Design a protein with these regions (language model features):
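Gram-negative/organellar outer-membrane beta-barrel architecture
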Residues: 41-50, 56-195, 355, 363-377
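Solvent-exposed loop/turn segments connecting transmembrane beta-strands
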Residues: 55-66, 91-101, 111, 197-198, ...
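Transmembrane beta-barrel architecture of outer-membrane proteins
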Residues: 48-50, 64, 98-100, 148-152, ...
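Short loop/turn motifs that connect adjacent beta-strands in outer-membrane beta-barrel proteins
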Residues: 21-23, 37-47, 61, 75-84, ...
């Protein structure tokens, strides 16, 4: 692991304008070949694997190191219509004692007639709970410390209806247990209707327009999605509630090496929504720079604009700006305050069109580094 960590630091710091650069590139390319980080995809390998480590710092996890294992594959090598499928496995451990694993799979079948997307995670993370709403999130001295033990799984199967239009059906499972609560803090979680342990299970249906050229890192196209998920005791859930998700993103290639991307995203819930399932304002994808879980409410809206620039060799950079708001009802969103988010990031093309990203996000009164695979959106 130490050798991999040193390699990642070299990728971040090595010069891009010197005679020694060529030798450095050749040497680093040789190391990367051993890690599976070829700049070409070989479908004959079945799943073309690669591994990449890297450091990170986030407000909630502290300083840590993560490792991403990326596999590219084509279920049918003769299928020239579908884009390449990707399987990403990520793991991390941090100075706060947090550790976790996650999986993302984007699979395309039968000339893109069928798609199977799977996202899942398990984590053990020391964190804090502030409560619901801006008022609770602003009271930093009244937060409750606990360890979040989380297991999530969300598979979805899509069928193409007409060109670029897909109908999907799936399932959402989320189990969360608040362990090791600090009894010197105010008992916020214990006071919620659901208590420290919550299990949510629901069926979902969604419809989307998707003409992105490559899902993990689009250069052009649009993605518009509506998803409805119903959670109920009859489906295994502790409580009954509904979640509506709306998303739109657009990708415009300004040149061969630059892309302008923007998105608008909303999550809206109603019913007996557990504290653990309320939408969040702050994550490694949206509103980067805020402590994940500090701001949560029944309804959340955010947007961001990001400029992406490919440099020489495998290097790239991004810069973004965004904002978000939240509230207990739809009408309250008109009166809620907006939080800003901005930042810059470094990109390293680990596999063809698959980037490892290191972002630094700045929010109002907080900031953080994020190490992930694939673009934020």
């Amino acid at each position: 692991m130490s050798r991999l960590f040193i390699l990642f630091l070299l990728l971040l710091t090595y010069p891009i304008c010197s005679q020694a650069e060529t030798l450095s590139r050749e040497k680093i390319d040789g190391w990367l070949q051993h890690l599976g980080a070829s700049d070409k995809f070989d479908a004959s390998k079945g799943i073309d694997w690669g591994v990449m480590p890297g450091p990170f710092y986030t407000p909630e996890l502290g300083l840590g190191i993560g490792t991403a294992v990326v596999g590219m594959y084509r279920p049918d090598p003769q299928d020239t219509t579908s884009q390449n499928s990707t399987l990403t496995l990520s793991g991390y451990a941090s100075s706060t004692g947090a550790f976790g694993l996650s999986v993302k799979n984007y699979a395309f079948f039968d000339n893109d007639l069928w798609r199977v997307f799977v996202e899942g995670s398990m984590a053990n993370t020391p964190t804090y709970y502030w409560g619901q709403g801006f008022h609770a999130g602003d009271k930093d001295n009244e937060k409750e410390k606990y360890t979040a033990q989380v297991l999530t799984l969300r598979p979805t199967i899509y069928r193409q209806l007409i060109d670029n239009v897909y109908l999907g059906t799936g399932w959402s499972l989320a189990a969360q247990n608040a362990d090791e609560m600090d009894h010197d803090d105010l008992p916020k979680i214990e006071s919620t209707p659901q208590g420290p342990s919550v299990f949510s299970s629901g069926a979902s249906i969604d419809i989307n327009w998707d003409d992105r050229d490559f899902v993990p890192n689009p250069r052009r196209g649009q993605y518009a999605n509506f998803r409805y998920t119903h959670y109920a005791p009859g489906l295994g859930s502790d409580t009954r509630f509904d979640e509506f998700q709306l998303h739109y993103s657009h990708y415009h290639a300004l040149s061969e090496k630059s892309v302008l991307a923007w998105e608008a995203d909303g999550a809206f819930t109603q019913g007996d929504v557990p504290w653990s399932m309320m939408p969040l304002l702050g994550s490694d994808e949206r509103m980067r720079g805020y402590y994940q879980g500090r701001y949560r409410d029944k309804n959340v809206v955010s947007g961001q604009l990001e400029y992406r620039r490919q440099l020489t060799w495998r290097h790239g950079i991004v810069a973004w700006a965004g904002a978000g708001t939240m509230g207990p009802s739809l009408s309250s969103l008109n009166n809620g305050r907006w939080l800003p988010s901005a930042g810059v990031g470094y990109r390293f093309e680990f596999k063809p069109r698959v980037n490892v990203r290191l972002d630094y996000g700045i929010g109002k009164g907080s900031s953080g580094f994020y190490f992930q695979v694939g673009e934020a959106f």
